[in-house]
């Protein structure tokens, strides 16, 4: 295949949108305004099924997303104070826990946690604001492909396999500044909050932390698991997250 000559981010964006349109039966002939290109690129990535694509596309996509990550601003752990430094907390392990509000896809740490769904393929809703969509969009289409390969192996044993609530799956991070993505499926609150749902959420945190140890992940950033689309009450979820992390540190 002839090598594509790309000079800058603008040309990369043109190429990626064009190739993603070609790759889509439904949208192969759409006309894209210059101002809408980045939104269209993300949307086409979101709806794309996990199928093979050219090495040249991946090369251009990877360079584009890595440069975009730099432009967004990469945040290292050294620049995030612990709760002891920030709030003067005197609780146990206050020097090992931080609270940070921001874009998790900017973090240059060992692992970030993704609030996934039971199909494990990311969010297919174009431009959706959920964490699953944000992480997959910034990582690149390779992440969905790896998740698909994981699910394909599981479904060799069980055709109807869905990732269970409270488990954790570790994948590469691809074009994110972190090293790994830890995917966990949180509980869904349909009506009242029950002890089982609380325990399910606790298991999400424990599974992620245990997986981190197994993979040599020494720094981990949790998003707010289940508090968005899955309707877990914010305050209750925060208490579970904090108490579970603290208990884990006591035994490790």
Q: What label would you give each PLM region?
A:
Residues 1-252:
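Macrodomain-like recognition of ADP-ribose-binding/processing modules
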